[in-house]
């Protein structure tokens, strides 16, 4: 992505290449103007309606910049190389794949990442190892039929509205898989031009998810079978456009161990709020990075940083406890010392 940034610090001493990933994009939400909303009250509400940081990625940017500054200021304490990946387009799972293809993970031995909030809902808490990040495919289907007079010559038409509707219903009827979690959702259906016109166009926006990459592929292929069958049934053409996607993933045990030790040493984390590992049950395209690093023989892990939230993720009133910035930075920095400290 053109808005992504990658920076590297080289100590000049032999060691591992340790990368950190921080997602930086906003979401399509208008931020609250309620007087009780702290960002509005204190004058740092989003400037543009319809787009805001309602998922905590501004916090991730802050942690990433703090990490880069602290490691640069204390470079003599370290060995090896540090790479800071500020990733665009996590929302919609569109950013990791092109950045990985651009080579941002080349030579990486360890990759660390995480997120503010989600299941870590208490300030001072942490989830050290996040597992079962779901694989997903995001795709649009356009059906192209043929318009005709609905009463005078319906036989001359090819109804793309019915094709889109039939596809949506059939996709939601796909048999789930016994090997793990699978999901399907058709979130948008648009079609037609007029009440007395056979609809020449139909559009659906869809996503599949699976506990593993293989389970997601099972769901996606079933959807493709349905699209092809429905198109033949109604005599329409179709076009499928992949708009995003990511692999599934589990944190490496070694990274979970490192995070847990760092959390127990941190003055910003409460021991009773440390959770060793938890299944995520949702999608995050860090999983693509994680899978790529692990496939190449490296280690990767994803943590969740505890914070009290004013409202849920992707809500216009979203706000987090800024003590999470200290917690996240401290755990990542201690993990950096554990992996690439001079005495590690």
Question: In which residue ranges do the predicted regions lie?
Answer:
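A non-catalytic alpha/beta surface segment that caps or lines the substrate-entry region
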Residues: 1-14
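DPxDG-like acidic metal-binding loop motif
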Residues: 61-68
């Amino acid at each position: 992505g053109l808005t992504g940034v990658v920076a590297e610090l080289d100590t000049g001493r032999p060691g591992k290449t340790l990368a950190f990933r921080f997602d930086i994009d906003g979401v399509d939400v208008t931020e609250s103007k309620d007087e009780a909303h702290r960002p509005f009250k204190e004058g740092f509400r989003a400037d543009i309606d319809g787009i805001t940081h309602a998922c905590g990625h501004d916090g991730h940017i802050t942690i990433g910049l703090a990490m880069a500054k602290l490691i640069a200021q204390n470079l003599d304490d370290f060995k090896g190389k540090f790479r800071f990946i500020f990733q665009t387009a996590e929302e919609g799972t569109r950013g990791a794949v092109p950045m990985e293809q651009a080579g941002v993970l080349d030579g990486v031995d360890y990759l660390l990442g995480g997120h503010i909030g989600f299941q870590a809902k208490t300030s001072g808490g942490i989830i050290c190892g996040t597992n079962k990040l779901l694989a997903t495919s995001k795709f649009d289907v356009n059906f192209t039929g043929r318009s005709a007079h609905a009463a005078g010559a319906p036989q001359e038409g090819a109804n793309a509205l019915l094709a889109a509707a039939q596809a949506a219903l059939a996709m939601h009827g796909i048999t789930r898989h016994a090997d793990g979690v699978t999901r399907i959702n058709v979130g948008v259906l648009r079609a037609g031009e007029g009440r007395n016109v056979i609809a020449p166009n139909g559009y659906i926006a869809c996503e599949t998810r699976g506990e593993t990459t293989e389970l997601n592929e099972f769901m996606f292929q079933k959807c493709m079978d349905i699209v092809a069958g429905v198109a033949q049934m109604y005599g329409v053409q179709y076009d499928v456009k992949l708009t995003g996607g990511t692999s599934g993933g589990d944190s490496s045990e070694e990274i979970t161990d490192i995070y847990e030790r760092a959390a127990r040493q941190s003055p910003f984390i409460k021991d009773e709020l440390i959770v060793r590992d938890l299944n995520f049950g949702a999608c995050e395209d860090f999983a693509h990075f994680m899978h790529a690093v692990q496939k190449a023989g490296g280690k990767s892990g994803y943590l969740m940083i505890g914070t009290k939230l004013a409202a849920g993720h992707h809500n216009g009133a979203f706000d987090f406890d800024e003590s999470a910035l200290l917690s996240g930075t401290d755990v990542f920095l201690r993990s950096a010392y554990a992996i690439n400290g001079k005495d590690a």
